Regions:
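Small cysteine-rich, disulfide-bonded extracellular modules of the LU/uPAR three-finger superfamily
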Residues: 1-96, 100-136
């Protein structure tokens, strides 16, 4: 029996492309996402400040790379994702969702630093900062 499980390259590319095709919304979460969450749960776990809005990233602004030797696929933003300057406190961001708007499909990227976002901060992800790796 195999030690490693998961998608093969073709299936991984198909799954990720389904989410980013046509553009994907980057959403900041103040409550941890769960494996079985749907778009409804995303709405309740997202930053709730009145000056916050999701950022749609066109599919051309995402890069997919494959490391065949290690069986990994990596999705990375190749352009600035800019939420702008906060006018209110947004709370502590614990997860980032890359969401196919209008569906229940999303990629959960753990925000390992759990930043507390307060009034007057510029919230930006430079190219290469949002990275999701699918594989062992």
């Amino acid at each position: 029996m195999a030690i490693e499980t998961g998608f093969n390259q073709s299936a991984a590319e198909t799954a990720v492309n389904q989410i980013i095709s046509g553009g994907a919304d980057v959403r900041l979460m103040t409550t941890s996402l769960d494996y079985d969450d749907t778009a409804t749960e995303l709405d309740t776990k997202e930053v709730s400040s009145t000056d916050y809005t999701t950022v749609n990233v066109p599919d051309a602004d995402w890069d997919i790379s494959v490391d065949v030797a290690n069986g990994e696929l990596t999705l990375t933003n190749n352009a600035l994702v800019d939420f702008g300057e906060t006018q209110n406190d947004w709370g502590t961001v614990v997860d980032v969702a890359i969401h196919n708007d209008g569906t229940d499909d999303f990629i959960r990227a753990d925000e390992v630093n759990d930043p507390e976002i307060t009034t007057g901060e510029l919230v930006r992800f430079p190219a290469g900062e949002i990275t999701y790796t699918l594989g062992p």
